[in-house]
Regions:
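Gly/Ser/Thr-rich phosphate-binding loops and adjoining beta-strand/alpha-helix segments
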Residues: 3-6, 21-53, 69-83, 137-140, ...
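Short amphipathic alpha-helices and their capping loops
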Residues: 1-22, 84-90, 153
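Hydrophobic/aromatic-rich structural module bridging two neighboring secondary-structure elements via a short loop
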Residues: 63-100
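Acyl activation and transfer enzymes in specialized metabolism, enriched
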Residues: 39-64, 179-198
Length: 212
């Protein structure tokens, strides 16, 4: 995994970094209803897996925003070239395990690869993620049983800096189908403008999925 250290002497958000890093709860989060009308039609027409299709769009969108690829290590910031997703996979006993996926490939290849990795993850059946391997992850989850307007996520102490992205049950409003998508980020790295950029990128990925 390629990465670089940011120069803290020239980092333009140094004051913001220091301030938000000092807080006991340094996170900023929001939930936005994302239009998936056309995407859902494509999923149904091509018999695509809903979760993995959305996960691919989310992964591509997040990686388009540099701040979503940045992590705090000690008192410094590293920026990864590409971040993988770590998502929950439902198990037959009602629990779940974690599965790591790399979205840096064409969508047609990703769907085959991701389905295979999910089956392998079920056999491993673990939620352990330790050491440096966790830094380059985007934490992904879903709540497919309910539509919601806000979401509170569990976070560690001390705070980590991995973005958490979750979506719920899609619903119809008028002639559009909407999906609630939540984002939680460390405010020392990510401001509202960067979160807005993620949602714009997500709209773009949804519009153009499969055109790579």
């Amino acid at each position: 995994m390629g990465y670089r250290y940011l120069d803290m002497e020239t980092y333009k958000r140094k004051n913001h970094f220091d301030y938000f890093s000092s807080l006991s709860y340094p996170y900023v989060g929001i939930t936005v209803n994302v239009d998936i009308t056309d995407l859902l039609q494509k999923i149904k027409a091509e018999n695509l897996p809903f979760f993995l299709t959305v996960c691919y769009c989310v992964s591509k969108a997040a990686n388009k925003v540099p701040e979503f690829r940045q992590r705090i290590v000690g008192d410094r910031i590293i920026e990864f070239d590409n971040c993988k997703t770590s998502h929950t996979v439902a198990l037959e006993d009602g629990t779940y395990c974690y599965c790591t996926l790399d979205g840096n490939m064409p969508f047609c290849d990703y769907i085959v690869y991701a389905a295979r990795e999910q089956e392998a993850a079920k056999k491993m059946n673990t939620i352990d993620e330790e050491g440096d391997e966790v830094y380059d992850k985007l934490f992904i989850s879903t709540l497919p049983w309910v539509s919601y307007t806000s979401l509170i996520q569990p976070v560690p102490i001390p705070a980590d800096s991995n973005p958490r992205i979750t979506w719920g049950k899609y619903f119809v409003q008028g002639d559009r189908t909407l999906l609630p998508v939540s984002v939680l980020c460390h405010h020392a790295l990510v401001d509202g403008i960067h979160i807005a950029s993620f949602y714009r990128q997500l709209d773009e990925q949804i519009l153009n999925i499969g055109k790579d």
